[in-house]
């Protein structure tokens, strides 16, 4: 990803909001989907104003291939920007991928101290 990184030794900001996208991908397009998502889509969405980070995961025990992308946001306004609107969508995969998405607001957090 090409987004800004914190200086060495500093932590990334802790997001108050997450934008989560879950997708079920047919096996016949999975390789092309992953290449496009990892190399094109994730960086272009992650570089939108108000996006702090972007990661993808695959479900280890799913029947069918389920993926999730988790974007940390400064605020829910990030997904309402013109830049995001211009970059969102599934490109050539439109109509082939089942998905759902939502913005989640942080209600609690915990980070263990290690020593």
Residue ranges and their predicted role:
Residues 2-115:
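Macromolecular interaction modules
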């Amino acid at each position: 990803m090409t987004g800004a990184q914190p200086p060495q030794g500093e932590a990334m900001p802790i997001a108050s909001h997450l934008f989560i996208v879950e997708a079920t991908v047919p096996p016949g397009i999975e390789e092309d989907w992953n290449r496009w998502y990892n190399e094109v889509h994730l960086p272009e969405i992650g570089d939108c104003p108000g996006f702090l980070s972007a990661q993808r995961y695959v479900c280890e025990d799913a029947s069918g291939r389920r993926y999730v992308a988790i974007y940390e946001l400064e605020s829910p306004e990030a997904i309402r920007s013109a830049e995001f609107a211009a970059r969102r969508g599934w490109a050539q995969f439109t109509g082939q991928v089942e998905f759902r998405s939502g913005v989640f607001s942080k209600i609690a957090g915990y980070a263990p101290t290690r020593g």
